Design a protein with these regions (language model features):
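N-terminal amphipathic/basic leader segments beginning at the initiator methionine
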Residues: 2-47
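Mg2+-dependent prenyl diphosphate-binding active-site environment of isoprenoid biosynthetic enzymes
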Residues: 41, 49-142
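Accessible peptide chain termini
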Residues: 1-2, 119
Length: 142
């Protein structure tokens, strides 16, 4: 699926979930983490030049696909619903919030000289310091 199709499918799932909310906020977070992860990842571009995928977009996608709870974008959607908004208009903001958090984690791991994040070696150890810094900066720009 292309990114636009992923976004449409993800939004349809989130709209269905919003129409039938679970009994607890915790259930909402658990039930919707995967679909929001797919939505967030659909905002990661791909490049026409293979180096862009190798050295920038690929590392960010790999990092982003390694999970996380996706609480921040889910809270953004919940806030949108709480004030009567249309969550379709909150998708880019929700994704930007998660990408900002991703950038903070990548840069924090460098500053702290961390060795693992989410059970795997940190990006600066697997991809190199330069790629990790640039990937974190890319995530900030999204």
């Amino acid at each position: 699926m292309n990114p636009a199709e992923v976004r449409n499918e993800s939004m349809n799932e989130l709209l269905t979930a919003a129409a039938n909310p679970p009994a607890s906020f915790e259930e909402y977070l658990i039930q919707n983490a995967k679909v929001v992860g797919d939505l967030v990842n659909s905002y990661i571009p791909s490049g026409d030049h293979p180096d862009m995928d190798t050295y920038l977009y690929g590392p960010l996608m790999k990092y982003s696909e390694n999970g996380g709870k996706r609480h921040r974008p889910l809270i953004c959607f919940a806030a949108c619903v709480a004030v009567g908004g249309d969550i379709r208009h909150a998708a880019s903001a929700a994704s930007a919030i998660e990408h900002f958090h991703t950038a903070a984690l990548i840069h924090d791991d460098i500053a702290d000289e961390a060795t693992t994040r989410r059970g795997v070696p940190c990006m600066h150890l697997t991809e190199g310091l330069g790629i990790a810094i640039n990937t974190g900066d890319l995530a900030l720009s999204m």
